[in-house]
Amino acid sequence: MNPNQKIITIGSICMVIGIVSLMLQIGNIISIWVSHSIQTGNQHQAEPISNTNFLTEKAVASVTLAGNSSLCPISGWAVHSKDNSIRIGSKGDVFVIREPFISCSHLECRTFFLTQGALLNDKHSNGTVKDRSPHRTLMSCPVGEAPSPYNSRFESVAWSASACHDGTSWLTIGISGPDNGAVAVLKYNGIITDTIKSWRNNILRTQESECACVNGSCFTVMTDGPSNGQASYKIFKMEKGKVVKSVELDAPNYHYEECSCYPDAGEITCVCRDNWHGSNRPWVSFNQNLEYQIGYICSGVFGDNPRPNDGTGSCGPVSPNGAYGVKGFSFKYGNGVWIGRTKSTNSRSGFEMIWDPNGWTGTDSSFSVKQDIVAITDWSGYSGSFVQHPELTGLDCIRPCFWVELIRGRPKERTIWTSGSSISFCGVNSDTVGWSWPDGAELPFTIDK
């Protein structure tokens, strides 16, 4: 091979190597560009987020909360939650609230509450002793947490409310508007599905605790009319947020307000407040067709406040100290009854649970169990029932639970505001203890001085 041929051969080989190297570099650049494009696309893919925990939402299988089981047998009450919202609110951003209540789905329990459109220790908390204003809204947060703008979910505009879960979605009922023409707005999964207009034009109001769901239908009780005389009371049956049936109670000489309702063996029992003339609590029980029975808890262990000292009860309204009242609850077990009540007979202070083994039908004042919840030297307030379904607990029965509102501020304390925290307990058939779980906040706040 002469020198010219060698030069041509070496040059050709170098050119081939250069071309191959160039092609490999181009391929590498294309590969990097494609990989980068895929990663960038994934980073910018829109994902829905929750407004409470900022985690990507995952599809959750729905169930039907049957409500066909009986209440679990219990021997006492185990502490379930305490939010300490007034103590935390002296320094943190916590809503001014009242009328808190708890309701559970098959996945979680949430605290619902009526805000005043204001925060504790802020100028807008002034005058929040008022029950009904256009600023009041129903909101919710995880149970046991202090309700704040950072963990709470808006539910409805309301100065009276109820909420419950049927196994698929949350139903909320929010009443707002003028006293002589308020409207209840029903929402299902956050979407308005129906409305109920005041039919007596006299402060339409509802439970201030959870509604009750059985086999996909949910039930609530509403009142319209005088708070100190005969009013009108209706039971509503709702499916997916729409009213499918309602019945007005034929209940002369009865007074029902702020009912605490729960399912038991496929039927609903509600224990309510008589603000007219009863120191004992009226009840209404009904089936899924709204066929109902009415009565008063007969026990001589009286459950309302104010009330007389325990004595001889009645299966009708007990008149002494019967005017006014406070929201409360009881759980029926055959002829027996667990009664929740304030310790004081004339002020909203203290709280206790009493087991009267024949108090649903018997009029004596004997009882066999008393469990302390709040000392008589500490403020309490409203109380109400809620339940945990077997789909949540894994039990073969419906667990009874209750919450107690711990009101602070006006009218009993020297502040410019009225608000409250809450505690809750659930029934168990094991060891429990009586104690005092008070609100515990030191008042007044800076804004009050």
UniProtKB/Swiss-Prot annotation:
A Pfam family matched in the record: Neur
Transmembrane segments: 7-27
Involved in apical transport and lipid raft association, as annotated region: 11-33
Record-level Gene Ontology MF annotations: exo-alpha-sialidase activity; metal ion binding
GO biological process, alphabetically ordered: carbohydrate metabolic process; viral budding from plasma membrane
Cofactor: Ca(2+)
Membrane topology: Single-pass type II membrane protein
Main location: virion
Residues holding Ca(2+): D274, G278, D304
Disulfide bonds: C72-C397, C104-C109, C164-C211, C213-C218, C259-C272, C261-C270, C298-C315, C401-C426
Top-level class of the enzyme under EC nomenclature: hydrolase
Signal peptide (residue range): none
Catalytic activity from the UniProt record: Hydrolysis of alpha-(2->3)-, alpha-(2->6)-, alpha-(2->8)- glycosidic linkages of terminal sialic acid residues in oligosaccharides, glycoproteins, glycolipids, colominic acid and synthetic substrates
Stored InterPro entries: Glyco_hydro_34 (IPR001860), Sialidase_Influenza_A/B (IPR033654), Sialidase_sf (IPR036278)
Active-site residue numbers: D131 (proton donor/acceptor), Y382 (nucleophile)
Chain positions carrying an annotated carbohydrate: N68, N126, N215
Annotated region (Head of neuraminidase), positions in chain: 71-449
Localization: Virion membrane; Host apical cell membrane
Intravirion side: 1-6
Activity regulation field: Inhibited by the neuraminidase inhibitors zanamivir (Relenza) and oseltamivir (Tamiflu). These drugs interfere with the release of progeny virus from infected cells and are effective against all influenza strains. Resistance to neuraminidase inhibitors is quite rare.
Hypervariable stalk region as annotated region, ranges: 36-70
Keywords: Calcium, Disulfide bond, Glycoprotein, Glycosidase, Host cell membrane, Host membrane, Hydrolase, Membrane, Metal-binding, Signal-anchor, Transmembrane, Transmembrane helix, Virion
Residues given in the record as substrate binding sites: R98, R132, E257, E258, R273, R348
Further information: The influenza A genome consist of 8 RNA segments. Genetic variation of hemagglutinin and/or neuraminidase genes results in the emergence of new influenza strains. The mechanism of variation can be the result of point mutations or the result of genetic reassortment between segments of two different strains.
Chain's role: Catalyzes the removal of terminal sialic acid residues from viral and cellular glycoconjugates. Cleaves off the terminal sialic acids on the glycosylated HA during virus budding to facilitate virus release. Additionally helps virus spread through the circulation by further removing sialic acids from the cell surface. These cleavages prevent self-aggregation and ensure the efficient spread of the progeny virus from cell to cell. Otherwise, infection would be limited to one round of replication.
Name of the molecule in the record: Neuraminidase
Name of the coding gene: NA
